[in-house]
């Protein structure tokens, strides 16, 4: 054991030295070019490296931290390796190293993970039938990066399902995810104004486009408000949350989250602001607060809907958030969401669905593959089609179908979509069981409630968003750590059988 530790220390020291030399040379060249953005990223990499070294056997914590972020890191040609991809790659290397040192078990958990393995088989078949190169994680046909992302998602699942999480780890993960969402949202907003080429906010399709659009950088606001709102509701019961001791900070924070979400223009996120308290209240059996919350929600929505256009005028982004309710909404908001000439239908998503169905009918079992033909993209840019049609075709080429199930079916076949459906079902069942089993067990319970809400969001959002490759990046790690928690709680329960009851330690849920 001492020899293994000494060898590991030597390997780490050599790796740090070589990495530091390479980083110093690269930073010098960037400084000479005046590339401040890259220098900032290098500084962040140094801080992250120190953080990873100090984690030691808790190296896996870089996964939830990195996956909660969505920032560009290392430039690779004309592409960027995201913080999510970098975090999983680093964790995978450390995982393999620990396996080689006989310090790390591997737990496949086939009873729970079989849908993931079948999904991977469908992905492998798709890649075999339509292989693409791996240059810069994308090749000139643009699709290999998606296959790499799916492989990374599986690696994150495997690592997290093999660990033994403790209560302090779950607390750290929740708080780190909040900071990660805050940093990502802040980066997206700043990038919109300073680095528009590096943000997804500038490419979001909208029928209403002008210099000061009400649905551009505003979208990033819900990335912060919804997780913070859910975190506050998950860490303590409503009875304690609304007590005299906490009401002076809890109510203002919850109201602020509602306002920020309204200003984001995200209708689905606003719906979650009312659904998540319902889920948490039912889980805790706080039926009185459930009734009071329903009355309060009805009052707030009535004031906003009935007062709009009569007593006050809401910001356009807030109107977009509430536009599905009957009210006097601005015509520009209606034009950007309903199309006006299509009887309240979303023209954009309807067209995307029709295109996906065409591919599914032609190739129902294997899909068209996760690839983009460069010649087709150039031809698309050179056509005289309308801007909306170009946007739709470009997003479809990149597998951004705005419908997870149709997208998976079109990309890698209907069987893959069926297996992913089973995965989502097991994911939901797992976190329901975790909520029941971890009831009033401090951060185990808070984490389970928080992630249960996120799982419900994944499922409900699947018909308006999702992606064949990025959805596994978002969801599989949550499944992996959920299985690890479930196994840990089951083991603890078995150990406690037949033993006398001991006094419970302080819990955040009391």
Language-model segment annotations:
Residues 179, 397, 411-454:
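Hydrophobic transmembrane alpha-helices and their immediate junctions
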Residues 339-354, 358-412, 431, 435-438:
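Long extracytoplasmic/lumenal interhelical loops at the membrane interface
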Residues 235, 277, 289, 420-430, ...:
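Transmembrane alpha-helices of multi-pass inner-membrane enzymes
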Residues 73, 202-220, 390-408:
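Juxtamembrane membrane-water interface segments that cap and precede transmembrane helices
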Residues 1-129, 165-175, 239-251, 289, ...:
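Transmembrane signal-anchor hairpin modules in multi-pass inner-membrane enzymes, especially those
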Residues 2-26, 44-50, 121-124, 151-159, ...:
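Alpha-helical transmembrane segments of multi-pass inner-membrane proteins
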